[in-house]
Amino acid sequence: MVARAGGREAVTRFVRIAAWASAGDRVALLHVQPVTGRTHQIRVHLAYAHFPIVGDPVYGRRGDTSGLARQFLHAWRLTVRLPHAGERTFTAPLAADLVAYLETLGTPAARSPLLAEVM
């Protein structure tokens, strides 16, 4: 995907983990995998696809009312290749402020089995 003329190609894969619909607003928790590593790649691609990141002051919605003090971005699982240790995978549960935000949305209207892993 190239989001603007003259931009370099960047590839991002994303899958919906859960979705909420509250007060006319739609929110989705996504599993995102950047294939290329461009600056702001995830933020730009999700905004371009009409899924702006909650709390993003640049590419997000104006007048964000989430109450988050930061962007809803979380590195849940990272896999790296280390020269002497081979491939290693690290995971981290969703941060407490992000879990609290999701709880304010109520029960998801749709969810995948991956939701239990992420939370």
How would you label these PLM feature ranges?
Residues M1-M119:
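RNA pseudouridine synthases
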